[in-house]
């Protein structure tokens, strides 16, 4: 488990203050290092993108793309908006099932080894034993 450092607690408190708007306060914006710190806190180990990832086969003549700076620095944004820029979770690697594996190199029993040697016949050595 990771210990929570005082800087993480500060960023948590900061994010909560910035991202929760009260009736008297105007909308808040996140810019520069504050925006990066908020994204690191929200996304954690997944990482984040400054622009939303595009799908395959996207046209080079598309409309100009807005990024996190446009949405959270020039305008205000909420926690859900920040989460949209987090990298997707990588699927956990599952342990392979033992039953699903084919066992072709299974050790042979003594009887199988004896029968195999007996079927070879004598190769000039009458006293051949295993």
From Swiss-Prot:
GO CC aspect terms: alphav-beta3 integrin-IGF-1-IGF1R complex; exocytic vesicle; extracellular space
Cysteines paired by S-S bonds: 31-73, 43-86, 72-77
GO MF annotation list: growth factor activity; hormone activity; insulin-like growth factor receptor binding
First and last residue of the signal peptide: 1-25
Gene3D superfamilies: Insulin-like
Residue ranges of the region described as D: 88-95
Propeptide regions on this chain: 96-130
Region of interest (B), ranges: 26-54
Biased segments, Basic and acidic residues type: 102-115
A: annotated span: 67-87
Region Disordered: start-end pairs: 97-130
Biased composition (Polar residues): 119-130
Protein name: Insulin-like growth factor 1
Native source species: Cavia porcellus
Lineage per the UniProt record: Eukaryota, Metazoa, Chordata, Craniata, Vertebrata
